[in-house]
Swiss-Prot record:
UniProt-recorded name of the protein: Cytochrome c oxidase subunit 2
Compartments in which it is found: Mitochondrion inner membrane
Keywords: Copper, Electron transport, Formylation, Magnesium, Membrane, Metal-binding, Mitochondrion, Mitochondrion inner membrane, Phosphoprotein, Respiratory chain, Translocase, Transmembrane, Transmembrane helix, Transport
Binding site for Cu cation A2: 196, 198, 200, 204
Main localization of the protein described in the UniProt heading: mitochondrion
Binding site for Mg(2+): 198
Residues on Mitochondrial matrix side: 46-59
Cofactor requirement: Cu cation
GO molecular function, one term: copper ion binding
Function: Component of the cytochrome c oxidase, the last enzyme in the mitochondrial electron transport chain which drives oxidative phosphorylation. The respiratory chain contains 3 multisubunit complexes succinate dehydrogenase (complex II, CII), ubiquinol-cytochrome c oxidoreductase (cytochrome b-c1 complex, complex III, CIII) and cytochrome c oxidase (complex IV, CIV), that cooperate to transfer electrons derived from NADH and succinate to molecular oxygen, creating an electrochemical gradient over the inner membrane that drives transmembrane transport and the ATP synthase.
GO cellular component terms listed in the entry, alphabetical order: mitochondrial inner membrane; respiratory chain complex IV
GO terms (BP aspect): ATP synthesis coupled electron transport
Source species of the chain: Bos taurus
SUPFAM superfamilies the UniProt entry points to: Cupredoxins (SSF49503), Cytochrome c oxidase subunit II-like, transmembrane region (SSF81464)
Length: 227
């Protein structure tokens, strides 16, 4: 969950998001070291009176600054590709939910159940109850079981949308005429908020996403009450 004046990411709730946080720290360390080295070299160039106007070539230096960046790029690319393949992997999902983007709300369909579908609209600010979050609360939350692999099928009825939940490391484009898929698995129960992350019109900011992850027995009770 985000909070005011937050500088970092939201707390990771899924294994994928934990991997993304580790990759971010790994890449940030490399960028910090390179930036420090470049700033140090620039400061030396500005403060020293020594020059090398007679130097015509320096093959050793050229070899180093060709090979070293290649090694650094490999150190960044390998963990990035690993996470990319992990995000695309689908392992026997326990539940499949189809979400459709509309201007400007989301609709959900639990394909493993008959007639379990609903629309999810943002609750207007004037109707919020004490403790509820402005521009993030919806009238129908997406209730899902925790610690289970869930497949999300994402598409759109009209224009481009994007279904995103930061704390779960999810962001999937909703494209008209195309069905994209992603998987999620929450390691703990709770409410997780997201929003449409693709500009889709005048009310783009009013398309929140709320996932309610609960233990399996509570999910079964909820699904039975919705049928």
């Amino acid at each position: 969950m985000a909070y005011p004046m937050q500088l970092g990411f939201q707390d990771a709730t899924s294994p994928i998001m934990e991997e993304l946080l580790h990759f971010h720290d790994h890449t940030l360390m490399i960028v910090f070291l390179i930036s420090s080295l470049v700033l140090y070299i620039i400061s030396l160039m500005l403060t020293t009176k020594l020059t090398h106007t007679s130097t015509m070539d320096a093959q050793e230096v050229e070899t180093i600054w060709t090979i070293l960046p290649a090694i650094i790029l490999i150190l960044i690319a390998l963990p990035s590709l690993r996470i990319l393949y992990m995000m695309d992997e689908i392992n026997n999902p326990s539940l499949t939910v189809k979400t459709m983007g509309h201007q400007w709300y989301w609709s959900y369909e639990y394909t493993d159940y008959e007639d379990l579908s609903f629309d999810s609209y943002m609750i207007p600010t004037s109707e919020l109850k004490p403790g509820e979050l402005r521009l993030l609360e919806v009238d129908n939350r997406v209730v899902l079981p925790m610690e289970m692999t869930i497949r999300m099928l994402v598409s759109s009825e009209d224009v481009l949308h994007s279904w995103a939940v930061p704390s779960l490391g999810l962001k999937t484009d909703a494209i008209p005429g195309r069905l994209n898929q992603t998987t999620l698995m929450s390691s703990r129960p709770g409410l997780y908020y997201g929003q449409c992350s693709e500009i889709c019109g005048s009310n783009h900011s009013f398309m929140p996403i709320v996932l309610e992850l609960v233990p399996l027995k509570y999910f079964e009770k909820w699904s039975a009450s919705m049928l």
